[in-house]
């Protein structure tokens, strides 16, 4: 409302609970993933109704950390913030005049009461973005540590970056023919 943008709130609780009643032992991570996927079902359905496309809000930091639910918040076909670190998204929001109450709200998927991204990740976005910046440019752990960054945080970021690499790719397809549709697929116009 503060931005003058039409919005609609849809309670996904009945749909989520309808499934989770059959999985009473689901932990918080699984429950959060179910909620994120249900939210994406609603967004894609409404986009079909409106003849529109869902717009993603994920950022580079979340993608590099693998901090998203596969086939949920990583699904929108348009993601204008996807190549911006989280701290850059905040800078852009302030530049565009987004109300401070929105910009300064602790980052959260808003699926579990009291949950915050930084608590889940074990590092602040400010520190994570700086470390990611150097890792992506080929700096070694020792070089980043010499700049004054805590070794345990560098190793945490590096481990997340490496262990979630698979989440940033399309599913692997077994190549059984010369026309297999996977990472190497060439459309006829590409030949």
Model feature map: region roles:
Residues 1-64, 144:
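ATP-dependent adenylation/nucleotidyltransferase module used to activate substrates
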Residues 11, 58-59, 103-104, 145, ...:
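Short loop/turn and capping residues at structural boundaries
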Residues 17-18, 64-65, 110-111, 152, ...:
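Short secondary-structure boundary/hinge segments and terminal tails
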Residues 18, 42-45, 88-92, 130, ...:
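Alpha-helical scaffold segments in soluble metabolic enzymes
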Residues 31-39, 52-127, 133:
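Catalytic subdomain that performs nucleotidyl-dependent activation
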Residues 116-191:
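Peripheral terminal appendages
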């Amino acid at each position: 409302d503060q931005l003058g943008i039409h919005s609609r709130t849809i309670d996904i609780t009945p749909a989520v609970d309808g499934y989770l009643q059959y999985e009473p032992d689901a932990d918080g991570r699984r429950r959060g993933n179910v909620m994120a996927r249900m939210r994406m079902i609603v967004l894609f359905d409404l986009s079909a109704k409106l003849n529109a496309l869902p717009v993603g809000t994920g950022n580079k930091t979340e993608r590099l950390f693998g901090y998203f639910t596969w086939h949920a918040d990583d699904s929108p076909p348009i993601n204008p913030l996807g190549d911006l670190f989280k701290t850059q998204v905040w800078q852009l929001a302030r530049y565009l005049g987004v109300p401070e109450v929105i910009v300064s709200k602790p980052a959260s998927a808003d699926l579990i009461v009291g949950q915050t991204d930084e608590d889940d990740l074990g590092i602040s976005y400010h520190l994570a973005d700086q470390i990611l910046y150097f890792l992506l440019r080929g700096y070694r752990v020792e070089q980043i540590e010499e700049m004054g960054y805590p070794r345990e945080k560098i190793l945490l970021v590096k481990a997340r970056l490496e262990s979630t690499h698979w989440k940033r790719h399309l599913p692997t397809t077994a190549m059984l023919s010369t026309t297999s549709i996977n990472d190497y697929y060439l459309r006829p116009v590409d030949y």
